[in-house]
Amino acid sequence: MTLAEEFRSRNFSIYGQWTGVLCIILCIALGIANIFSFAVLRIIFSVLCLISGLILIFIEVPFLLRICPTSSKFDAFIRRFTTNWMRAAMYGVMSVVQWLSLLPGSGASSLIVAAVFLLIASIFYALAGLKSQEFVGSKTLGGQGLVQMIV
């Protein structure tokens, strides 16, 4: 299945996964950009954003669990997020954490962009769950086709 065919499938988990890839890029970039601040709360939220981005890499690009040396506890933690509902909940929690970066001690920052895109990914996964669509991983990002080629 090509990338265009994946998007035409109208499976919201595909949309959620590709929005998740965008969230990875945004969380890492904005986490690094906002860490150079004098506001202690903003530094804390930027570190949390950076950690979120690093966790999302392993959740959204599954073949990385096979090629990167990780502990069995970390692998078990990542494998919890295989359903649409669990991913929607995870993205929702990460979004709420970034929305909390608007607290008065931190002030408004570009971390809001990460919060918005994390919320969009959460909505896509929740819609997939509501429509009872099975989670389908993109083959481009390491779905079944790529994983079988590596093994």
Curated annotation (Swiss-Prot):
Golgi membrane protein involved in vesicular trafficking. The keyword Transmembrane applies. The keyword Translocase does not apply. This is Golgi apparatus membrane protein tvp18. Glycans are attached at residue 11. GO terms for cellular component: Golgi membrane. Belongs to the TVP18 family. It is a multi-pass membrane protein. It comes from the Eukaryota. The chain crosses the membrane at residues 21-41, 43-63, 88-108, 110-130. Keywords: Glycoprotein, Golgi apparatus, Membrane, Transmembrane, Transmembrane helix. GO terms for biological process: vesicle-mediated transport. It holds the Pfam family Cg6151-P. The gene is tvp18. InterPro entries: TVP18/Ca-channel_flower. It is found in: Golgi apparatus membrane.
